[in-house]
């Protein structure tokens, strides 16, 4: 019996040391991310966020660190086509994933993405700090609307402002755009121009 208890204590101690090691020191993990069309391999601590992996390890500085708490949206990127807050996303959970930043939305020959062009045409930024996150969020939001995903303000009617169109797409009224972009803050207050830029692209 004492021998058995000794083994149990040893097992508990091993689990404890692993847990403490993870909490205080983390564990290194090798992963590959396809960032803006380019495969990038790196070794990171398991606690490293996708934002820190991109900025600090891969020198991809398009996504910005604003609040670092998932409240401002400046860090938004597209992860396998879906918009995510990279400051709340663990890099190790997405080994092999496709990551697209605002810088990667332009074509290989340098032609701007329609959203990038629209933000320029409508002065959808002032200081520009939130702009990469705004553009990535808008790109993800347009894809969600095209797939028919409703928002909190989507009308129950089959058509009309904010409602669904005949092909199942969500008609993006200004209210829809504001609701769907509400997770991205602009401290300069360029919201009117941001909505105008997205409205132009959504109408095409």
Where are these regions (language model features)?
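Ala/Thr-enriched low-complexity intrinsically disordered regions
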Residues: 10-13, 19
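Signature of N-terminal electron-transfer/Fe-S-associated modules in redox systems
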Residues: 17, 21-204
């Amino acid at each position: 019996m004492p021998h058995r208890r000794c083994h149990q204590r040893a097992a508990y101690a091993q689990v404890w040391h692993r847990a403490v090691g993870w909490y205080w020191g983390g564990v290194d993990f090798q992963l590959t991310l396809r960032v803006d069309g380019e495969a990038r391999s790196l070794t990171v601590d398991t606690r490293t966020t996708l934002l820190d992996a991109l900025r600090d390890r891969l020198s991809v500085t398009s996504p910005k660190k604003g609040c670092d708490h998932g409240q401002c949206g400046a860090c938004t990127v597209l992860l396998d086509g879906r918009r995510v807050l990279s400051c709340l996303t663990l890099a190790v959970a997405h080994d092999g994933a496709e990551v697209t930043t605002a810088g990667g939305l332009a074509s290989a020959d340098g032609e701007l993405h329609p959203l990038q062009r629209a933000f320029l045409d409508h002065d959808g930024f002032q200081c520009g700090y939130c702009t990469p996150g705004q553009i990535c969020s808008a790109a993800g939001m347009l894809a969600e609307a095209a797939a028919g995903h409703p928002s909190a303000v989507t009308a129950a009617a089959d058509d009309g402002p904010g409602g669904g169109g005949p092909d199942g797409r969500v008609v993006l009224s200004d209210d829809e755009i504001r609701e769907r972009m509400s997770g991205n803050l602009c401290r300069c207050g360029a919201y009117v121009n941001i909505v105008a830029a997205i409205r132009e692209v959504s109408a095409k």
